[in-house]
């Protein structure tokens, strides 16, 4: 066990002092069953909240961060896949749903506890404390360079390593061979002496019954096969073809559009606005004087934008 830092010791005392009595009840554990209905389709098994495996051997990384040009969809998938020894050509990603189970305690823990190292016997309890807190806040954010250093290191890598351990154990139980004799390579588990092998997808039914390890062994830097390499970004093809969904593509029943013209100088107010000019324009529903800005609400964006441009506004 690593040497306790003063920060870790104080943090453990504060956090555990009031909640350790709850014990296992507040530990996050494997929440796969709680998100299966949100992310799994037919033929897919949710190994943990960060990944699912299909019978056709496709691995899907569930990414809880927004893509803003930083390549996080690919980077986090690489970290997960590397720990699994997965075939990168069979890895894809999906964005995590806006659900409480995806409130990211790894990010909260990273910002608050920093690099503090807690003893293993407290680790799961502390994770549970942070999970309880972030779920109450619906804490699912992107920022602060947190995606790789917190979610990647403390969620994706652990999720990948845990899934690999479960797959190896499933093969060991099925073939009646020591788990130490098994290796995983490119989404296939192999037993050299007997010549037996099976894809991750083939092992999924058995692996789903294996208990999830809370502290799976992570690779050393020398063992990385994907991390630290340059790989084609997973999000680019859909952006090129136009299939990718952006925030502005989202539509909900009864949705309307608004465009706003704000005062050109900080502190100035709307002096006058002639609503008669555009109120009869097709699709225009309402013109709102916000005091420091004017908004036009319409059935469509272009209708709102066109009407706003026609409005005579004096600030």
Positions of the model-derived regions?
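Cofactor-binding beta-sheet edge motifs in enzyme active sites
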Residues: 1-315
């Amino acid at each position: 066990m690593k040497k306790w830092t003063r920060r870790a010791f104080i943090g453990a005392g504060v956090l555990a002092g009031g909640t350790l009595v709850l014990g296992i009840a507040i530990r996050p554990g494997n929440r796969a069953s709680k998100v299966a209905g949100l992310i799994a389709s037919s033929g897919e098994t949710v190994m943990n909240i960060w990944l699912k495996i299909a019978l056709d051997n496709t691995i899907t990384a569930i990414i809880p961060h927004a893509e803003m040009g930083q390549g996080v969809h690919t980077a986090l998938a690489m970290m997960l896949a590397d720990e699994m020894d997965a075939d990168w050509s069979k890895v894809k990603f999906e964005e995590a749903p806006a659900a409480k189970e995806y409130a990211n305690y790894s990010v909260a823990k990273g910002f608050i506890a920093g690099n503090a190292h807690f003893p293993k016997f407290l680790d799961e309890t502390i994770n549970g404390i942070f999970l309880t807190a972030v779920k109450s806040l619906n804490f699912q954010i992107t920022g602060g360079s947190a995606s790789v250093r917190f979610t990647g290191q403390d969620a994706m890598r652990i999720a990948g390593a845990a899934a690999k351990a479960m797959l190896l154990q499933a093969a060991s139980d099925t073939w009646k061979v020591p788990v130490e004799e098994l290796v995983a390579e490119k989404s296939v588990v192999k037993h050299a002496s007997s010549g037996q092998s099976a894809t991750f997808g083939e092992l999924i039914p058995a692996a789903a019954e294996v208990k999830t390890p809370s502290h799976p062994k992570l690779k050393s830097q020398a063992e990385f096969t994907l991390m630290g390499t340059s790989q084609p970004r997973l999000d680019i093809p859909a952006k090129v073809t136009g299939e990718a969904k952006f925030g502005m593509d989202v539509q909900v029943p009864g949705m309307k559009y608004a465009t706003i013209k704000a005062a050109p100088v900080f502190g100035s107010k709307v002096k006058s606005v002639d609503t008669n000019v555009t109120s009869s324009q097709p699709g225009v529903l309402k013109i709102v004087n916000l005091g420091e800005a004017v908004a036009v609400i319409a059935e469509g964006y272009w209708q709102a934008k066109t009407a706003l441009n026609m409005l005579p506004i004096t600030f």
